[in-house]
A protein has these predicted regions:
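Short, conserved phosphate/pyrophosphate- and ester-handling motifs at nucleotide-, phospho-/glycolipid
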Residues: 48, 100, 226
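A short local loop/turn or secondary-structure capping micro-motif enriched for an aromatic residue
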Residues: 34-37, 101-103, 285-286
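Short alpha-helix plus adjacent loop in nuclease-associated cores
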Residues: 96, 100-113
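Core-facing hydrophobic residues within beta-strands of well-ordered domains
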Residues: 70, 200-202, 391
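Active-site core segments that coordinate phosphate-bearing ligands/cofactors
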Residues: 4-5, 17, 108-127, 132-166, ...
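Short beta-strand-loop/turn "lid" adjacent to the catalytic site in phosphate-handling enzymes
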Residues: 43, 65-97, 123-128, 158-182, ...
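A conserved helix-loop-beta module that forms one wall/lid of the active-site cleft
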Residues: 189-210
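N-terminal glycine/serine-rich phosphate-binding loop of ATP-dependent small-molecule kinases
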Residues: 1-94, 119, 146, 218-222, ...
Length: 441
C-alpha cells in the first residue's frame, strides 16, 4: 500500500508518502511549526490551533498532488497537549502544549496542581498533561464556555479533515492526558471525580485503529501518539529491541506484552494489546548543546567577533576524552539531569570526581556524552529488572545520535550490542503511515 503520514510536532510539521510493503519513502516534506502565541506569561506555552491545521493541510495536500495513488492517511503528533472543541467540532481556544507550565505554579495554598493531584488521588502527573491543564483552567475560569470536550492537536486535525463533530482519541494519546488506566484502556473517572472534574468532558476513546472518515475520498485513521508512531516507524513491532531517541530530550522505549511501571518508567498503550515501556531524560541532547554554548561563550569573551559553532571540535575532544576515560582509574563523571527528572523536577546535574589530571575539555565533553547515555541506560535497567527483557537489537533515532558517532559507541558499550540508526529520519510520520494500514475488520 501507498500511505501518507502526518506528524504535527512542537516545532515542525512533517509528512511522508510511504510504500508500506517495501518500506521505501517516496516523498517527504517538513515545514516549520511557527504557531506559538506570546501570552505574556512565561509559564504558558500555547500554540494557534487553526494555524497548525492550515499548515498541516498544506503539507498533506502537497503529498496528495504528487502521489494520487495514496490509499490511506495516518496521523500522529505531540502528545499530552489539548485543544478544546465545541459541539460542532470547532476549536474554541489554542493548543495548550505539553510544555505548558501552569501545573507547576504554586497557586494552591503554596502547592502546585501536580502536588494537589498526587496528594488527593495518588497519581504521578506532570505539568502539560491534558487533564492537569484542564483542571487548572477549570479552577481558574479559563475553560471556554462553548467547550464540549477536548483532544490532541492531531485528533483535531483528523476531525477537520473528515468533518467529524466529536473526537475519537486512541488510547496512546488518551493515556498522555493523565488520569488514565492503561491496563483497562479507560479514564479513571473515580479519580477525576476526586478533584471535582466533570467526566462528561472526557473524549471518546478507542484501543483499535479505526477510520475517522475520509479526506478527498481517502480513509483517515485515528491518530496515535508520537512516541508510539516513532517506535512503529523505526522498529515496527519487533520485541527485544530497544529504541533510543536523542533529540532535544532523550527517550528509551521497548515493546512488552507485560504491563510494568516503576519510578521513571511508564507503560503506554501500543497496538494489538501490547505496551510500550518507556522512560525519558528531560535534558537529553540539549545537555550537549548547553556544553557547546559554554565553549562558544568562552571564545566570545576571548576573541573579537562571533565564534563559529563548536560541534566539529567537540567531536575531536570527545574522541580523545573516550581514550582517557577508558584508561583513567578515576574518570570525571557528569550527571546530565540539568533540567531535573519527571519525578524530581527540582533536581539538577553535577560534575564529580574532578582531579587535577581529568579536569580537561576532552574529559568534560566525553563526560557529558557518557552522562546523557547513562540516564537512558539506568532507565533500561529498571525495565530489565521488572520484565527481564533481553536486548538483542538497538535502534537509534534523532540528530543527537545521527550526528554523534562517539555517543553511538557509548551506548554500544553500555548495552553490549551494536546500534543501528533508524532507516527513516521522519520516524513518527512513517509510523503514522504504517498505522493507517493496520485496520482490522
Amino acid at each position: 500500500m501507498i500511505a501518507a503520514g502526518i506528524d504535527i510536532g512542537t516545532t515542525t510539521i512533517s509528512g511522508v508518502v510511504l510504500n508500506t510493503e517495501s518500506g521505501q519513502v517516496l516523498m517527504s516534506r517538513t515545514v516549520s511549526n511557527d504557531s506559538f502565541i506570546d501570552t505574556g506569561n512565561p509559564w504558558e506555552r500555547v500554540q494557534d490551533a487553526a494555524k497548525i491545521v492550515k499548515q498541516a493541510r498544506l503539507v498533506l495536500d502537497e503529498l496528495l498532488v504528487q502521489h494520487p495513488e495514496i490509499s490511506s492517511i495516518g496521523l500522529t503528533g505531540q502528545m499530552h497537549g489539548i485543544v478544546y472543541v465545541d459541539q460542532d467540532g470547532h476549536a474554541v481556544g489554542p493548543l495548550y502544549t505539553w510544555q505548558d507550565g501552569r501545573g507547576n505554579l504554586l497557586e494552591f495554598d503554596g502547592h502546585s496542581l501536580t502536588e494537589v493531584i498526587r496528594t488527593a488521588c495518588g497519581l504521578q502527573t506532570a505539568s502539560g498533561y491534558g487533564l492537569v491543564t484542564h483542571l487548572y483552567n477549570e479552577r481558574n475560569g479559563l475553560v471556554p464556555t462553548e467547550a464540549e470536550t477536548f483532544c490532541t492537536i492531531m485528533d483535531y486535525f483528523g476531525m477537520v479533515l473528515t468533518g467529524r463533530k466529536q473526537p475519537l482519541v486512541h488510547t496512546s494519546n488518551a493515556a498522555s492526558f493523565g488520569f488514565f488506566d492503561v491496563k483497562n484502556g479507560c479514564f479513571q473517572e473515580d479519580k477525576v471525580a476526586v478533584v471535582w472534574l466533570d467526566s462528561a468532558v472526557l473524549p471518546a476513546v478507542t484501543d483499535r485503529m479505526e477510520i475517522l472518515g475520509s479526506y478527498q475520498g481517502i480513509p483517515v485513521t485515528a491518530a496515535i501518539g508520537d512516541n508510539q508512531a516513532s517506535f512503529l516507524g523505526a522498529v515496527g513491532d519487533k520485541e527485544n529491541t530497544v529504541l533510543l531517541n536523542m533529540g532535544t530530550g532523550g527517550q528509551i522505549s521497548v515493546i512488552s506484552t507485560e504491563y510494568f511501571e516503576t519510578s521513571g518508567i511508564e507503560a503506554r498503550p501500543f497496538l494489538d494489546g501490547k505496551y510500550l515501556l518507556g522512560g525519558a531524560s528531560l535534558c537529553g541532547g540539549r545537555a550537549y548543546a548547553i556544553l557547546e554554548k559554554f565553549f562558544r561563550e568562552y571564545l566570545r569573551a576571548a576573541e573579537s567577533g562571533e565564534p563559529k559553532v563548536q560541534y566539529s571540535i567537540m567531536e575531536v575532544l570527545a574522541r580523545k576524552g573516550k581514550a582517557a576515560f577508558t584508561s583513567c582509574g578515576a574518570p570525571l563523571a557528569v550527571d546530565t539531569a540539568f533540567s531535573g527528572t519527571r519525578e524530581e523536577p527540582d533536581r539538577r546535574g553535577s560534575i564529580t570526581g574532578i582531579s587535577e589530571e581529568n579536569f580537561t575539555p576532552e574529559a568534560l565533553t566525553y563526560g557529558v556524552l557518557h552522562g546523557m547515555a547513562k540516564e537512558l541506560y539506568d532507565l533500561y535497567r529498571k525495565i530489565d529488572a521488572g520484565c527481564k527483557i533481553s536486548v538483542s537489537h538497538l535502534i537509534g533515532s534523532g540528530n543527537g545520535l545521527r550526528k554523534n558517532p562517539v555517543l553511538v559507541e557509548i551506548f554500544e558499550d553500555m548495552f553490549g550490542t551494536g546500534l543501528e540508526l533508524s532507516s527513516y529520519e521522519e520516524e513518527a510520520a512513517c509510523g503514522a503511515a504504517k498505522s493507517s494500514c493496520m485496520i482490522k475488520i
